[in-house]
Amino acid sequence: MNGTYYESDMSWKLHLKLKSALEARGMEVITTRTTQAGDLGLEARGKKSAGCDLFLSLHSNACNSASVDAPLACCTVTGTMDVLGQQLANVVHQVMGTAQAGTIWKRQGDNGDYYGVLRGATKVGTPAILLEHSYHTNLRATNWLLSDANLQKMAEAEADVIAAFFGLL
């Protein structure tokens, strides 16, 4: 691992770049917060998406093996965003050059989706994806994610996929 990497910093930078890229393609974008400090609870973040066409939560993953280097799109158990989830996982794989291909994954909890942000979005009728940009326990992936230029490439590629999915390209 690279000790200078913080998932929260990467996610914050990437979301700002992705927001700009989506807006440049004609989409309206809202975020769950306006500053990096402070945060809503997990389910409340998802619920903030009421009225939106998509809730997207940006992350990097972690595991106990430094060799795992793959994107993962955690989709809601409803299956409504499986196609877009796979497309986003594929583009993360292509842009980052991860060792393993991207996949989608679902996890059922006691009250619907296991992940609070997905559960919250589903409760207000918003299709949702939690997108893992590989694993920050992998040094190559972490070093890639530390580059602002790489995050810009990722934001542009993800914005193209989302815009195409919604028929805007």
Task: Label the predicted regions.
Residues 1-2:
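Short, surface-exposed beta-strand segments enriched in small/polar/acidic residues
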